[in-house]
Amino acid sequence: MIRKAAMPLPNVTLVLGGARSGKSAHAEGLVEAAAGGGTYLATAEAGDEEMALRIRRHRDRRGPGWTTVEEPLELASALAAHAAPDRPLLIDCLTLWLSNVMAAGRETQRERAGLVAALSAPNGPVVLVSNEVGLGLVPETPLGRAFRDEAGRLNQAVAAVASRVVFVAAGIPLTLKEEERTQ
């Protein structure tokens, strides 16, 4: 069961979890409970039929109170453009964005720093979804290990500026961090 927030959203909320953990549904529930919907900033690209189906399912799950913006790379700019005090911004997901950044040959440290700077003073509440990829086996390939390491660094950097951090396992949200900073 996904529990919905009964309180206003903090400036920045990070929702972490494994694959199919319920993290996206929980993040959507937080925004729904606080504002009845918001702006959904999607970082995924439908590169194949399976991913297109995932994107469609996510979109179908959200109600009419949502606006979708697709931005696979320019996340800090999109955050600045779409965050608003009266309309929460949900970014799903950071690890897909990171894979896009790495595939494009961009400097991950610079991109991460730009995102963290944008999150340090958002124009409205922001909820970010990210995969926790460091709990499994050590990846077999150098690229896989580099991705796992960069995802860990990204999650740590975002968690450091977030007022709330939630880990979702088996559909159950566990609050890891909660500070008293709301919009």
Task: Tell what function each PLM region has.
Residues 35, 61-63, 84, 121-123, ...:
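Short, well-ordered coil/turn elements that cap or connect secondary structure elements
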Residues 2, 9, 13-81:
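Conserved P-loop
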Residues 27, 58, 90, 131, ...:
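Residue-level signal for inorganic ion chemistry
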Residues 38, 89, 164-167:
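Short, well-ordered beta-strand core segments
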Residues 5-10, 84-85, 113:
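Catalytic phosphate/metal-binding cores of nucleic-acid and nucleotide-processing enzymes, i.e., regions
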Residues 61-110:
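Helix-adjacent hinge/juxtasegments
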